[in-house]
């Protein structure tokens, strides 16, 4: 009986007194607390799982939309719009990389980063063509101021010639180079290859150094002009060689040397042709000779030598 009394329910006096003082107070048991905690844990855990599932579903939908989105055709404007989607900092960084080439620094890998653009090459070529035509005309204007006997007339055709020359060089030479490297890639399995747009981008940015060089050619001193021309050519050609070397080094030494020599030679011909054509010495038809007094013929009688006839 004593054991049964011990197992019977006993009311504590303190609890009874507290309930008597605050009859409206709610009471909870330990089992209720455990139940509520489990319920909260289940709700929180289910919320996290639901959020993760929603995130995964959104990622799947995004990837599916990207896959289902049709790629624009190469003859449409949308296809080329992505190549002009660059900001000023990217263009300035690529210009800086073309002006400061050094061995082991690949312009394509360090500056293009598999994102070639046409914005920089397009405007660099346009600026170079315009500067060539303007400075070529300014050379004649300055020469006329030094020698008034020189007759100057604006040569607007130089704008067209400069534009055709620069744009053809910036597109046709990279096209030929890319085609040759692609052909050599079929014979050499380990040989890498740049894309056509990467090659065009490299050539376009390599022409930027000629813009300040052409402006400095306004100095009317021949040896200074040739010095700045050689310096600009060296920087531009070095950038091309350092960029193309990782691609051609897997080929034979003869082919690599011949290819790089051809690249430098074509670059030198461009610079030399611009120097000799747009800054050439004045032709003879631009120089008007000063009028000179022609001596009279000895058979012609001057008025003072004619004597009046007298009659006797």
Curated annotation (Swiss-Prot):
Lumenal topology: which positions? 143-160, 217-228, 275-312
Ranges facing Cytoplasmic side: 2-121, 182-193, 250-253
Q: Where does it live in the cell?
A: Golgi apparatus, cis-Golgi network membrane; Golgi apparatus, trans-Golgi network membrane; Late endosome membrane
- What are the BP-aspect GO terms? vesicle-mediated transport
Report the transmembrane regions from the record: 122-142, 161-181, 194-216, 229-249, 254-274
Q: Which residues carry this modification: N-acetylalanine?
A: 2
Which membrane topology term applies here?
Multi-pass membrane protein
User: Which InterPro entries does UniProt cross-reference here?
Assistant: Yip1_dom (IPR006977), Yip5/YIPF1/YIPF2 (IPR039765)
Listed Pfam families: Yip1
Gene Ontology MF terms in the entry? small GTPase binding
* Chief site of localization: Golgi
Gene Ontology terms: cellular component: Golgi medial cisterna; Golgi trans cisterna; late endosome membrane; trans-Golgi network; transport vesicle
Q: Which UniProt keywords apply?
A: Acetylation, Endosome, Golgi apparatus, Membrane, Transmembrane, Transmembrane helix
Q: Which family does it belong to?
A: Belongs to the YIP1 family.
- Quote the subunit structure annotation: Interacts with YIPF6; this interaction may stabilize YIPF2. May also form a ternary complex with YIPF1 and YIPF6.
Query: What is the protein name stated in its UniProt record?
Result: Protein YIPF2
